[in-house]
UniProtKB/Swiss-Prot annotation:
Keywords: Calcium, Lyase, Metal-binding, Secreted, Signal. It is an enzyme of class 4 (lyase). Pathway: Glycan metabolism; pectin degradation; 2-dehydro-3-deoxy-D-gluconate from pectin: step 2/5. It is found in: Secreted. This is Pectate lyase. The keyword Secreted applies. Residues 1-26 form the signal peptide. Pfam families: Pectate_lyase_4. Ca(2+) binds at D166, D205, D209.
Amino acid sequence: MKPKFSTAAAASLFVGSLLVVGVACADPALEVATTGWATQNGGTKGGSKAAAANIYTVKTAAELKSALKASVGSNGRIIKISGIIDVSEGKPYTTTSDMKSRARLDIPTKTTLIGITSNAEIREGYFYVKANDVIIRNITIENPWDPEPVWDPDDGSAGNWNSEYDGLTVEGATNVWVDHVTFTDGRRTDDQNGTANGRPKQHHDGAMDVKKGANFVTISYSAFKSHEKNDLIGSSDSASSTDSGKLKVTIHNTLFENISARAPRVRFGQVHLYNNYHVGSTSNKVYPFSHAHGVGKESKIFSERNVFDISGVSSCDKIAADYGGSVYRDQGSLLNGKALTCSWNSNIGWTPPYTYSLLSADKVAADVKAKAGAGKL
């Protein structure tokens, strides 16, 4: 018999329909995506229709893994996370392969994963989404720390250390909604790792990547904090066969705080970025700002009323950095309190097919600081 960690009382099945509707409207675990690209292609519903028997409350790594692997009906599952879960269960990872075998958490189709406490957090683990129709809400993800970084002498002019595993990877999946999720290096910031071969020894990879034909993704009211290479949308210039016409992603009302680069870095995708707040400095000792939007091969970025408070930056070339792209459109954004002016060809060739509500740029910072991230749902 498959374990169930939390089910609704049997009597609840017999309450009046009006009460059921009232409860459903008030329960964030039952909500579906209402903004951005995740509303397209039939919408993103996750486990919003899960049977009571397929609703789990988990407090440990073992319970979380069991809930993710459980056999459920066609309406999917809801997994409610309570408190801080250490996926390593107190046993440090010794190698990259050891980390992969114990830390990876695959999220199946029609799943809603939601934190139900203000401190709901995943540590020493990472999520992988290769299945369609997934919702992740109201949790903190401490970016994974690879114990075995690899030196690449050909990475950059002086070589670099590289590591594996992102906090969340969306690979080939369609219809994914990430809402009120905080990504952070947390307890292991990059200044703690020392140097080798004359370069900082980097134990982190990305925070969140969307790649290999993934599509119809919305990131809303989330927070990315204290990280170097943040969000990659499209993983390779040579992936046109899988990525062209896909990688449709919306990021809105989201905080990027002390992020060095890739906020996001885009290839191929029609990516809509609106009402986001970026704050940082080129002189930050741990996470110096390099660029925000990486304009890569065949990318089609629409940036709209974003706010960039970045000390040390005075022009668009550091906001929209050229990584082989040819078009980029910005409308109404602010850089350090002044209108952002870019010289890019703005003919991106598409407009958002969904309706959305825009804040004026002067209201973005206050809105995002008050509402974005885990614990603010």
